[in-house]
Amino acid sequence: IENINEKDVISEIIEIYDTNKMIFVKGGKFNFGSDNGLDREKPEREIIIQSFLIDKNLVTVEDFRGFVNESSYTTEAEIFGNAIVYNDSIDIWQLVDGANWEFPLGKSKKNSSHNHPVTQVSWNDALAYCKFCDKTLPSEVQWEYAASERGQKKNQLFYWGNDLLVNDKYMCNTWNSGYPNTIGFKDGFKYTSPIGHFEANSLGIFDMAGNVWEWCYNWHLPYEGNSQIFPTDLKGKAQRGGSFLCNSNYCHGFRLSARSATSPESSLFHVGFRCVKNITN
């Protein structure tokens, strides 16, 4: 840490925030976006970013339960009485009555596991949790900077390289076979996986590819210098990281620069989040 003022601020923050749960990401310059990706990822451009703290892990069911118990919070899925689930047996997305963060597939299905990422939480729910913890959701810039190890891995598809398998080992939780017609959990998981099951990146951050899409703070808009108009299904709050449903034959989501979006009130069974804490000098 080169700047004395920044060092003082960081020391004070570390006293407040459990650094066993958050990772300090030193700011700097990096190339954001990708000229080799989909149109929505273009153009690639240099950005200067300030230092911040980011959750080492995705927010878990257990974490979210603690928040609900302390704040008496009710999620939007619980208010609406349903949430969005993909039915792979008939290849269709459905609104399932009773689906929520405790029962991601619906009340008639298995309840959520305490050490898995919480899902069926809307952007509004995720932000409410972050604010309760005196944090916020990451911007897309922060997310990509952290996922790419401060921009050091931007010449790769993923933070570990360009292949999903390394030495016959799956590096993240994705759909591992031909989607949607064949069983896709050669990595051991059909749906979510426990936090920290797969290897972290070199900064010590887990699940920055696959498992669940992650809500970001900003709206999903064309980048500066990109004049395209996004179709309706790409308008909403930005999401990053891909999920257990992503497969390279149809989904780009687990690449470092990949983007998606969903309306902020929507709750889905393959979308979760993590928090950041901004550091101001």
PLM regions and their residue ranges:
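General helical structural elements
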Residues: 244, 259, 278-281
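Short, compositionally biased
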Residues: 1-105, 124, 150, 273-281
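Functional-site microenvironments in short loops/helix caps that host divalent-cation chemistry
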Residues: 25, 31, 36, 74, ...
